[in-house]
Each structure stands twice: as C-alpha cells, then as structure tokens.
Amino acid sequence: MNEKQKKTQKLRARLPRGFVDRSAADIRAVDEMIAKIREVYERYGFDPVETPLFEYTDALGKFLPDSDRPNEGVFSLTDDDDQWLSLRYDLTAPLARHVAENFNEIQLPYRTYRAGYVFRNEKPGPGRFRQFMQFDADTVGAAGVQADAEMCMMMADTMEALGIARGDYVIRVNNRKVLDGVLEAIGLGGVEQTNTRLTVLRAIDKLDKFGPEGVRLLLGEGRKDESGDFTKGAGLNEEQIGKILFFVGITDYARSADELAALVAGTARGAEGVNELNTIRGLVLSAGYEADRIKIDPSVVRGLEYYTGPVFEAELQFAVTNEKGEKVVFGSVGGGGRYDGLVSRFMGQPVPATGFSIGVSRLMTALKNLGKLGAEQVTAPVVVCVMDRDIESMGRYQRFVQDLRHAGIRAEMYQGNKKNFGDQLKYADRRGSPIAVIQGGDERASGVVQIKDLIEGKRLSGEIEDNVAWREARVAQVSVPEGELVAKVRQILAEQAEDRKRAG
C-alpha cells in the first residue's frame, strides 16, 4: 500500500455484534420505567447501592448461571498485577462481594436495589444481546421466607406501578427444596446421582419450549429434534418420570398440596420446601395478593441449579406476535429466588439472601406493546433562527434562547452553516420543533419577533395550494414585542399540548 492509499483509506464504522446503540426515545423510555420501579423499591424501604462494571473474575467464578460454560461467558482482561478482571455477568455476584467485603459496616438485614448494564460473552442472536440492563432488589441477612414473600409482593406492585393490569401478569413461585424432595423420593438423592439430577433439571427447564411430552422424552431415553439431532435423556423409568411430571404439572396448588406433601413426606428437605411454600402462600393472601397475582406454581424451574430455596418469576400473560407471525404469550420479564450460598462462599459462614432481577430491555418492549411507555412525548426544542450574523444580532438571538431556557422551555439557536432561511425552517421541521422564532433587520428595528407555529403551519399547508398565496398569508405566524416572546411561546406550546390531548 502506497502513501496515497494510506491517506485516503477510511476506517469502517461498525457496531460490535450483540450490542446496540440507544436512541433518545429509548433512553427516555428506560428512564421513565426505572423511575417508576425505583419508587416502588423505595416505598418498601430499600436503598440504592452501586458496584463497578468490573469484578475480579474469581468473584464471579462457578456461580455464573450458564451452567454449560461455568468459567466462560464473560468478557475478561488482566490488570497491571496480572489479575483477571471480568465485566459483571449479573448484578448479584457483585452484591455478594460488596456485602462480604463490608460485612462489619453493613446493617443486616441489608435491603438494597441497583440498576445497571451486565455483559455476556455469548453468541448473539435475535433478541439475545451481549449487553443489557437489569434492575435488581435484594435482602441479605434475612433467613425467613417472609423476605421471599415480600419480594413476590414487591414484584407484583412493580408490575402495577408500570401500568400492567391485573390479569396481564402473574408472579409464579416454586421452591428448589420441594424438587429436591421429589428427586430424593424417586431415588435420585445422594452425591452419586448429582449428574443425573442436573440432567433432570435441564430437562424440566425445557417445559415451556417442548411441552410435557418433550420433557418426558428428555427424562427418559432422549429426544430427537426436527433436524435429527439427538439429546441423550436422564434415563429414568416411567414411575420416576410420572412423579416429576406430576410435580411440574401442578396448576392448582390448593387442590394438589396434600398430594405433593405426601410425595415428599419421607424427605426432610422436601417437607421443609412444602412448608415454606405454604407459608409464602399464607403471607401473600393475608396481605391481599390473590392467586391471580401471586401463584404457587411448581412448573417454575428458572435457575434451580443456582437457587437454594424459593424461586419466583414475573410473567406477562398477554399475547404478542412473534417473528414467525404466531400469537404467543409474552412470558417472563424477570425473576429471582433465595441464594443462601452466594455470600457465604466469601465468608465461610452462612449468610442468607434473597432477591429478584428485572430484565429492563425486555420489560420495556412489553410496555411498548401495551402502550404504557413513551406516551408522554418530549417536546422538541424551539428553534431561534439566525437571520443576521453580526455580533449584535447574534447576541439578541442568544438572549432569546436563554430567556426561553430560563422559563423552562427547551430552546436552541440554529448552529448550522446554512444561511438560507428556508434551510433553517427545514432543519426545525426535521427536528420536530414546535415553534421557530424569527427576527430580521426590520423586526429588530421595531423591537419585535416573529413566532411561527410550525405544527399549525404544517396542518394548514394542505389547505393553501398556491405557494405565493402561502407565503403572503404568513400562515400560523404572529408578531409580538420582544418582551412578550416567552409568554407567547408558552401559550402556543400549551395550545399544541391541548390539541395533542384531544387527538390522542
């Protein structure tokens, strides 16, 4: 490559795979949603905390939820001391490190929330990103299931604060201990059965995807998919498979509770789990949360390898159209559970903890589908046009802008290079500006400004076909003294807002 080629070669602009640029509308929508979620968390007595994007990799370690890649899935680098650092995979492991490192200063139970980006070094795909936002709430140091019940109630209140109606969401609750009891009852207890239990957990995790019959195959000899690929099963017999499918198939806990209790009666862990579910059910019912809002549902299997007790999931139940044009239930927008082992691994002593995480990006999509987000349009700035470029004129334009800003009105002075007035109005139109402020030499000599209602002008433009007549009519344009600029702009903006309200 010669010197001339080097000089003319351009760097290719490209977005990394699995990442997205966020528009102003998306940023404002997320801010609106987070403010509503934060208000609920604060009402429950939770306080904010913030941890860094990077953690030492061993602080994340084998507790990464992606069980197939326990020591991968993260973006990592080494620092000057040859210590491995990784971008956080979730917000829970950093919280565990924070609690352990500051244990003597923290008041237990420690009730905290935080929002932030997390990063996954995984293959990206449709709806699967390498960077996304989560909003978590956790209670550390509370061993009783009342803390888990409170999490479920807070999730329900959060859904409603976001405008999701009852019937369009449900908080589903299960307990890892109950499943452990079921597995022990069918002969899958003990260290020697660890791998089989993991295979069973992964099989029932596919319940929503493959249905009961698909899970039956995965619990048995195995399943062949449409492409012909075969997944080896857990190798259970029909009796074992039947009891697992009974457990995950319970839809009415009140009617099936006795039968489930009998199934795990011989296992201490299973009986403890059933008792915890009954306690959670009693607490939420006493607080006025019926089963249409918080439901005991043994088919919830999220993170059962990760959690140690109750698990819960926030599911949206309305239908949406997927990329194949099919009507499907929107599904999960967040969840969590009890993770008593996560802080303890730093401490060498038991530290109970429970919490949940909301997938902000996914929930934002749901709220947009419901028309619950972004309804409050942000008014684009008023544009003060630049008719003359001498210092005195520019100073006046700048003063107009500052007067509007000090009155709480978004405003900008045209900063482009084009001197043509028509180009400035085109800029304002493309910007979505509601008003243009104009002052040429004649207006300046008279101490007045022209205020052009761009919204009304656009509406009326279709009613005047002749361009000459349009210019002469000065449609939607009014002249006012400089001192009345702010008041007139405010009046026009209020009228535009009223028009939008009537039209909406």
Curated annotation (Swiss-Prot):
Tell me the compartments it is located in. Answer: Cytoplasm
Q: What InterPro entries does the entry give?
A: aa-tRNA-synth_II, aa-tRNA-synth_II/BPL/LPL, Anticodon-bd, Anticodon-bd_dom_sf, His-tRNA-ligase, HisRS-like_core, HisRS/HisZ, HisRS_anticodon
Q: Which UniProt keywords apply?
A: Aminoacyl-tRNA synthetase, ATP-binding, Cytoplasm, Ligase, Nucleotide-binding, Protein biosynthesis
UniProt entry tagged with the keyword Membrane: no
- The EC code for this enzyme is 6.1.1.21
Q: Which GO terms describe its molecular function?
A: ATP binding; histidine-tRNA ligase activity
- Give the GO cellular component terms, alphabetically: cytoplasm
What is the catalytic activity of this protein? tRNA(His) + L-histidine + ATP = L-histidyl-tRNA(His) + AMP + diphosphate + H(+)
The UniProt record lists the keyword Glycoprotein = no
Q: Which GO terms describe its biological process?
A: histidyl-tRNA aminoacylation
Note the coiled coil stretches, chain numbering.
Answer: none
Assembly mode: Homodimer.
- Stated family: Belongs to the class-II aminoacyl-tRNA synthetase family.
Put simply, this protein is called: Histidine--tRNA ligase
| Protein's organism | Rhizobium meliloti (strain 1021)
